[in-house]
Amino acid sequence: MNVPLILAGSLAILGAGIHWVAGEVLVVRKLSPGMLPSSRFGGPVMTKTMIHAAWHMTTIAFLTVGSALLLSGSVLHGDMARGIGLLAAGASTGFAAVAVGLGAAYARSPRSLLRHPAPAVLTATAALAWWGAL
């Protein structure tokens, strides 16, 4: 049993669940097609559809990585556990880098990075994943 990987996986799965439900209710449903631009793929409704699909693809990515971390820390053993743990730690790092990087790029102050839990949760998940994988 690898406690850091289990914690990282549990955190990622919890985050995926929150991303799915809160994102659907608080973000996607509130997008008004009338306020969205058209794209070369179609009108505002198609833009909303693409945002909706991308949102839930991201949720599935979080769930997949979380499941891999959880399995690596609990059920899998040896080289298989290490390899999958390293891959999932790398993916977790990518998620954290995007959240922190884009958050910092658009932040008006360092404090605004703390308004949304994603940068901190994704960074904690990545740190736990690397701790457990190495």
Task: List PLM regions with ranges.
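Hydrophobic alpha-helical membrane segments
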Residues: 85-100, 119-125
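Membrane-water interface of alpha-helical transmembrane segments
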Residues: 2-9, 45-55, 78, 82-89, ...
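Core segments of alpha-helical transmembrane spans in multipass integral membrane proteins
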Residues: 10, 22, 26, 30-74, ...
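Membrane-helix boundary connector in multi-pass membrane proteins
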Residues: 97-115, 129-134
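Alpha-helical membrane-embedding segments
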Residues: 62-72, 114-126
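Polytopic alpha-helical membrane-helix bundles and their juxtamembrane interface segments
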Residues: 3, 29-33, 72, 123-131
